[in-house]
């Protein structure tokens, strides 16, 4: 299975069978990668320090794609491409960085968020929309 970066929108809907089944299969296949901006979004939901630590531990088993200056520069470049189309205010900074990291790693990006479809129109990178 190809390495996949899983957006926050997928993690939040993981209890829906149309999302959870493919996500579970990818996790079992050791094909899921995490990027810091997505992890930070997920950790915002922690109820306190203990919950925060538990969530971090759950995601610690996933592959990591570190962010670097090239990924940051690519995110800015993609945002510029979106601006030329009038869509630069849609995708968040997290979306742009996650997409750039996935692209750099040659990973597919899984989402439940239409912003990634806009990003992929600029980048041509592989994405997969899960859920309904």
Task: Place the predicted regions along the sequence by residue.
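Active-site phosphate/pyrophosphate-handling residues
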Residues: 9, 41, 96-100
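Active-site neighborhoods of divalent-metal-dependent phosphate/nucleic-acid chemistry enzymes
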Residues: 64-112
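Active-site-proximal, substrate-binding regions of enzyme catalytic domains
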Residues: 50-63, 68-70
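Short, hinge-like loop/turn segments at secondary-structure boundaries
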Residues: 49-53, 83, 126-130
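Short, well-structured N-terminal submotif of metal-dependent ribonuclease cores
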Residues: 1-34, 43-57
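A secondary-structure boundary/capping signal
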Residues: 7-8, 38, 112
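Acidic, PIN/NYN-like endoribonuclease modules and their adjacent C-terminal/linker elements
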Residues: 1-3, 16, 99, 103-132
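A generic structural signal for short hydrophobic patches within well-formed alpha-helices
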Residues: 11-12, 39-42, 72, 116-117
């Amino acid at each position: 299975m190809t390495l996949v970066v899983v957006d926050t929108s997928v993690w939040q809907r993981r209890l829906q069978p149309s999302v959870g089944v493919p996500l579970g299969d990818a996790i079992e296949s050791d094909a899921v990668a995490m990027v810091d901006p997505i992890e930070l979004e997920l950790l915002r939901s922690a109820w306190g320090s203990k919950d925060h630590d538990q969530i971090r531990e759950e995601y610690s088993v996933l592959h990591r794609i570190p962010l670097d200056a090239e990924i940051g520069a690519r995110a800015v470049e993609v945002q510029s491409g979106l601006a030329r189309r009038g869509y630069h205010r849609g995708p968040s900074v997290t979306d742009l960085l996650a997409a750039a990291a996935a692209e750099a790693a040659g990973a597919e990006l899984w989402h439940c968020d239409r912003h990634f479809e806009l990003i992929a129109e600029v980048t041509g990178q592989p994405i997969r929309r899960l859920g309904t």
